[in-house]
Amino acid sequence: SCLVGSEMCIRDRFNISSKTFVSVAAGVKISELENLLPSSKIFRAMPNVGAKDNLGITAIYSNHDSKEMVEKFKFIGESYEVENEDQIDLHTVLIGSGPAFFYDLMQEFEKRLDELLTDKESKRLVSIVFLSSIINAIKNGENLEELVESVASKGGTTEAALQKLDEKGFKKIFSEAVDAGIKRAKELSMN
């Protein structure tokens, strides 16, 4: 007999002591899971929202060989193994939260386009601008700096706008935002 709901009872009742487990819980370290499931193979996987369209990007970490698990996660998009568990935090902020950064920026584009077009037209055109930019980056395989330069003519409107972003510290603000996300991820793993 065991205490219903206790960790030991769950392990015994469902015979899960030597199974493979994949955790997608943010902030839950492998060591915590190993305490619950000492004889199991445990993997941490952090997919992003693109997984629902088979365009996900998943970081995988384990104390075991992760090559097979990396292959299994390719059914929802790209996947890769991180060398240490702390790298999951950076992945979570840049890849997991990344879509929210794009959506937020897209909203700002829409607000300005709303000065010219209807809300529906603005949403559609902004989505096309982002989509075509992404396709161009993937298709051409150029570095992003070269792609920026291909759009920004010397003395032109794009160059003026980019200079204003630099002047206002856009890159520094972005870096600080990423650092804030990583800090929060570390706080979550301590709770």
Stretches found by the model and what they are:
Residues 20-23, 41-46:
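Short hydrophobic/aromatic-enriched beta-strand-loop microsegments
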Residues 13-18, 35-38:
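Short, conserved loop/helix-junction motifs that constitute active-site signature segments
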Residues 1-5, 9-10:
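Single conserved hydrophobic/aromatic residue that forms the stacking wall/gate
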